[in-house]
Amino acid sequence: LRSTKVAVKTLGSVAASDLIAVLESLQIQVADEGDLTVVLTDDYLNPKLDKFNQQALKSQSPWMLVKPLGTIAWIGPLFNPQKTGCWDCLAQRLRDNRPIEGFIHRQKHVSSPLTPPLGFLPSTVQTALGMAATEVFKWIIQGENQQLENNLIAYDAIALQTQNHTWVKRPQCSSCGEMVNGLTKNPLPVVLEHRQKTFTADGGHRFCSPQETLRKYQHHISPITGVVRELSKIPGNGLTHNYIAKHHFFSIFDDAASLRQNLGGRSAGKGRTDSQAMASGLCEAIERYSGVFQGDEIREKGSYQKMGDKAIHPNVCMNFSQQQYHNREQWNGECQGWFQKVPEPFDEEREIDWTPIWSLTHQEFKYLPTAYCYYGYRPDYKLDCWADSNGCAAGNTIEEAILQGFMELVERDAVALWWYNSLQKPQVDLDSFDEPYFQSLKQYYQTINRELWVLDITSDLNIPVFAAVSRRSDRSVEDIVLGYGAHFDAKIAISRALTEVNQILPNVLFAKADGSTNYPPLCDRLAVDWWKTATLSDRPYLVPSDRVAAKVRGDYREMASDDLLADVKLCQQIVEKNGLEMLVLDQTRADIGLRVAKVIVPGMRHMWKRLAPGRLYEVPVKMGWLQEPLTQEQLNSFPMWM
């Protein structure tokens, strides 16, 4: 105590003298320059903290932040340049978790924090300062304070509770990170390894159980320091567990509607068990977060023409038709939801940022526009492509992420072929799978006056894909709900489709006084249009085909192995056998650890309304489903709304 000196600085309206008095009462030596500096502030994003942080990093001096004002005081973290992250690491997370403030900053072109007046009592300030002084005392006596080096502690004076919020060092931090700036780095190939599966029960084949995934990554859930602000369970029927996740997300359409969606929740998780649904929600949130453009991604400048063969034209992946481009202004003015919009035609001469993507097929880097690869990348020209989540997945290993991402591509591609060509497909005999869960679902749906059935919509890739369909049977508005699933294991694919139907079902369950459906106010307008207007009589492709026998369990061979790498290799073989190329963008973020991959197979179709020539027209003829390809005008005019 005698040899260690503590300095107190203040940035904001808090007086240093109050904390100095508490420190001195503990016999702590206070000086203008100390072995540890405590900084008092009323906002952890005070711009002056940046300069203080840089000085502390330069001098390798530990320091600690305290906000004693407001009903919830913040104590810590304690920044130690030799051991922990810095203020910049923390500030990045704090900004991400203030979506309304960030939106106002971007709209008004201001950067200073919007600190509201903080209500407090002298007694609550004294309590917070006393807690902070005690932590300083511990640091001096023990030579360290691991609790504060790893956490921001929030003290709620009203609830009389403290909460620890884990914060992590960001290896990519521009102030203290050891990773070099992304623009100067060379890309690394995606190297795959053998990975033994240990979990194959629910939702997919995994390297480890959902409980283990949660244990490893749930520290990323925090409204203050986390990448996921909130993970909440949605009340349900008990047959499927559903979670919704709120997290930072940047859309290129930076408007009030996008902000509302961010605040309401961008990601969801589903599963037959609570832990599976919770892990699913957390992983999808981290997947989305990891795909947001941060500025340190590896990029290469050039035009499509000058990049040569290594560049992939984005419309080979997006698949908009010339007619869609031609009519885009009228369509965009009328369409609902950003995922139905059509971008500007791609300018092949414009110099833009390109992102390297590893081709598993050719074992070399190819390039796609960065705007296509990352959410929220905002160029200074009219948008000619943008990112979506198709083929994106998180996993405990990169192999697991690639497998899940590829199955999503297969699912969406099969949905597009079935939906836009309005093809009747065989029903699946759920009883043949001898799965109690399937029976329980069917029985539950009967009790709420709904029918439930499953169609086999497997494509030419011969990976099982299913569409689960449910409609009301007691009135003219049928509120038809759909869910999809793809997997090497047909039973898991069916389960995915059924749990997705169950995930969407709450949107159509509640009634108004007149008996009509009471749709949630923030529901997508296109989805509500579908629920109000679609009927089986108008949409015969939703009805099982009576020309072929129902599919039974014995019709599906076992395709999966016990090794995730072998499964990925099989996916690659299937792609290449059909004359396509399989590419992977590793979107894993160094400060998170959960592996995230975006799998891209140019030519495979999204389920949204993208009507360029190719598989959409060719596969139904190749497979004998149609005698000749439909014209664009003959395709199903109602966009897939999910």
Located regions from the model:
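Helix-biased "structured C-terminal domain" signature
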Residues: 161-642
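E1/E1-like adenylate-forming module used to activate ubiquitin-like modifiers
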Residues: 7, 11-13, 19-26, 34-128, ...
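Short glycine/serine- and small hydrophobic-enriched flexible loop segments
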Residues: 131-139, 283
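Hydrophobic beta-strand scaffold residues
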Residues: 30, 60-65, 452, 582
